[in-house]
């Protein structure tokens, strides 16, 4: 996986990309991440990358030339040709399906927006605009870190466990089932007996039921689009009746 990030603040990425899973993925050559300072592609000696908006208004707008020159540089370096993404509040909401699509692309270019945004002509040159939520942050750097982390987890070999990514929340459209570890008894709260039984079939059934229940209670909006297995719809109906009887829905 080749990921190129165009940013005004490359130093922000040192911590997140130099530790944990992403660090190991880079060291093993599974993910190639390179940062490019947009100021290096400014057409003037002052390294200017922004200007006042035509028509007036507050704030500054990122100029199109430095970003275009940076994209051309990526093509010359063999890092172009992939999916070009602009991180901005107006983009499509990022989710697990988005992460899967970007991971499948093989090459990814992330443009971190800043100030009041980018010149509209930059938007015309990208393949996709992504937002990480209905809120505004200072720039696209932190959203880019989030996108890279979610995408890298889906690259084959990055996670230690072969099925690790498949068990995560949202992987099948559902929230993940509850997880437990030692001690068996903690402040009077015991680990469910089924998890100690050694009966893998019963454990899988319990986990599926808990994933359905947790999604139904916490994120019912996910249910319709989730990938359902045999018997899931009937189980959901039973769970919904139980919750209604308990006055929880």
Swiss-Prot record:
Residues at which S-adenosyl-L-methionine binds: 113, 132-137
Main location per the UniProt record: cytoplasm
Catalyzed reaction equations: guanosine(37) in tRNA + S-adenosyl-L-methionine = N(1)-methylguanosine(37) in tRNA + S-adenosyl-L-homocysteine + H(+)
Keywords annotated in UniProt: Cytoplasm, Methyltransferase, S-adenosyl-L-methionine, Transferase, tRNA processing
Highest taxon of source: Bacteria
Record-level GO cellular component terms: cytosol
Pfam families: tRNA_m1G_MT (PF01746)
Listed EC numbers: 2.1.1.228
Keyword Secreted: no
Keyword Cytoplasm: yes
Subcellular localization(s) per the UniProt record: Cytoplasm
Coiled-coil stretches: none
Record's subunit section: Homodimer.
Protein family: Belongs to the RNA methyltransferase TrmD family.
PANTHER family: TRNA (GUANINE-N(1)-)-METHYLTRANSFERASE
Protein name: tRNA (guanine-N(1)-)-methyltransferase
Organism (species): Desulforudis audaxviator (strain MP104C)
Upper taxonomic lineage: Bacteria, Bacillati, Bacillota, Clostridia, Thermoanaerobacterales
């Amino acid at each position: 996986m080749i990921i190129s990030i165009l940013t005004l603040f490359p130093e922000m990425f040192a911590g997140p990309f130099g530790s944990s899973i992403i660090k190991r993925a880079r060291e093993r050559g599974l993910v190639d991440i390179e940062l490019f300072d947009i100021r290096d592609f400014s057409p003037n000696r002052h390294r200017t990358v922004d200007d006042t908006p035509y028509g007036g208004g507050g704030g500054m707008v990122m100029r199109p030339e430095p970003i275009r020159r940076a994209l051309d540089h990526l093509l010359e370096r063999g890092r172009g040709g992939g999916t070009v993404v602009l991180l901005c509040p107006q983009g499509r909401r990022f989710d697990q399906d988005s992460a899967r699509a970007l991971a499948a692309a093989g090459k990814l270019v992330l443009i971190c927006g800043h100030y009041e945004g980018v010149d509209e002509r930059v938007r015309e040159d990208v393949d996709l605009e992504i937002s990480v939520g209905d809120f505004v942050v200072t720039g696209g750097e932190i959203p880019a870190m989030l996108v890279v982390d979610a995408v890298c987890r889906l690259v084959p070999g990055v996670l230690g466990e072969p099925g690790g990514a498949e068990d995560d929340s949202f992987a099948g459209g559902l929230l993940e089932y509850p997880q437990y570890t030692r001690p068996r008894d903690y402040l009077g709260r015991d680990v469910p007996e089924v998890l100690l039984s050694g009966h893998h079939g019963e454990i899988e059934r319990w986990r599926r039921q808990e994933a359905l229940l947790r999604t139904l209670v916490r994120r019912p909006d996910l249910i319709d689009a989730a990938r359902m297995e045999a018997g899931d719809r009937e189980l959901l109906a039973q769970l919904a009746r139980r919750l209604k009887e308990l006055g929880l829905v």
